[in-house]
Amino acid sequence: ETGEELYKTKGCTVCHAIDSKLVGPSFKEVTAKYAGQAGIADTLAAKIKAGGSGNWGQIPMPPNPVSEAEAKTLAEWVLTHK
C-alpha cells in the first residue's frame, strides 16, 4: 500500500489532515517542523507505531496497528507535504 492508502485505511484521517490542524498537526506542519533533520522518517515511524505525546500539545497520539514497514511508508509520505 502507498502512504496515501495507509493514511486513508489506518484511521489517520480521524486526527490528521494534509494542510489543516485537526486533533493532531497537519502533515505540512510536521514537515516544516522536522525539515532537514537526519533520521526523522525513522523517528516519525516509531511515533506512528508506538504513539507519543508532548510534541504537539496535550492530546497524545495513540499507538497504531501498523507494521514497521507500514509506519515507515506513512512517515515518508507525511514528509512529502510541504
Curated annotation (Swiss-Prot):
It comes from Azotobacter vinelandii. InterPro entries: Cyt_c-like_dom, Cyt_c-like_dom_sf, Cyt_c_ID. Pfam families: Cytochrom_C. Heme c binds at residues 12, 15-16, 61. GO terms for molecular function: electron transfer activity; heme binding; iron ion binding. The keyword Flavoprotein does not apply. Keywords: Electron transport, Heme, Iron, Metal-binding, Transport. The keyword Transport applies. It comes from the Bacteria. This is Cytochrome c-551. Binds 1 heme c group covalently per subunit.
